[in-house]
Amino acid sequence: MSSYFVNSFSGRYPNGPDYQLLNYGSGSSLSGSYRDPAAMHTGSYGYNYNGMDLSVNRSSASSSHFGAVGESSRAFPASAQEPRFRQATSSCSLSSPESLPCTNGDSHGAKPSASSPSDQATPASSSANFTEIDEASASSEPEEAASQLSSPSLARAQPEPMATSTAAPEGQTPQIFPWMRKLHISHDMTGPDGKRARTAYTRYQTLELEKEFHFNRYLTRRRRIEIAHALCLSERQIKIWFQNRRMKWKKDNKLKSMSLATAGSAFQP
């Protein structure tokens, strides 16, 4: 990453030593030697080495050696981040790393940098302190506002589930039509003598089975599966129903033929 960073930078800008890279180190090397970003020509490099926009104000860019990278990476949501940067610039007017007069130093709990030479020796650490405090306070303010906005909405939303819960039992009981009721109702699956209870069919199921039997008294397995899916029955139930229906049909035809035979013999001379 670092080699790609240096090579791309030196290829784009021939006078690379004029633009020294910032010092990314630990906290101990925070006050080390680094080039002031405010002293660099902002008009000559509008974009960073890898294409990020670095055209920011001098006061915010010189706040800390993390300021240039952090603000340029956050440059695309400009509307959401502008109040945070404005607060940072208004709290500390940083003209150069040597003199750091802070107007709101007491409010942030830090000393003015012009008080002692030891404070002047560490300008980067104090300026980083201010920006971090500003960012923390700016990020906490929207969270508090969001929590205050969400609390009344939650209070309003609480009565609604109660209303829906009262209406839920009414909606859970569907309307039962007469053709949906079973003709032979037996809640237990065993009959009075311990045998399996008679299968109860609804009027709709019986009507559909009677229509199918009217067209064809014998079913193929494919047609039986289709009827089972359509009527929410099992193949075994449909097979047994057709067997019983054929027996009934045979009995009816036998009685009809016998009655016709007796009627015909009665009219014989």
Swiss-Prot record:
InterPro entries the UniProt entry points to: Antp_homeobox, HD, HD_metazoa, Homeobox_antennapedia, Homeobox_Antennapedia_CS, Homeobox_CS, Homeodomain-like_sf
Bias kind Low complexity: ranges: 89-103, 136-158
Give the CDD domains listed for this entry: homeodomain (cd00086)
Q: In which tissues is it expressed?
A: Expressed in a broad spectrum of tissues.
- Give an example GO biological process: embryonic skeletal system development
GO cellular component labels:
cytosol; fibrillar center; nucleoplasm; nucleus
Q: Where is this motif: Antp-type hexapeptide?
A: 176-181
Family, per the entry? Belongs to the Antp homeobox family.
Summarizing the function annotation, the protein's role is:
Sequence-specific transcription factor which is part of a developmental regulatory system that provides cells with specific positional identities on the anterior-posterior axis.
Q: What is this protein called?
A: Homeobox protein Hox-B5
Q: Which organism is it from?
A: Mus musculus (Mouse)
| Gene from which this protein is expressed | Hoxb5
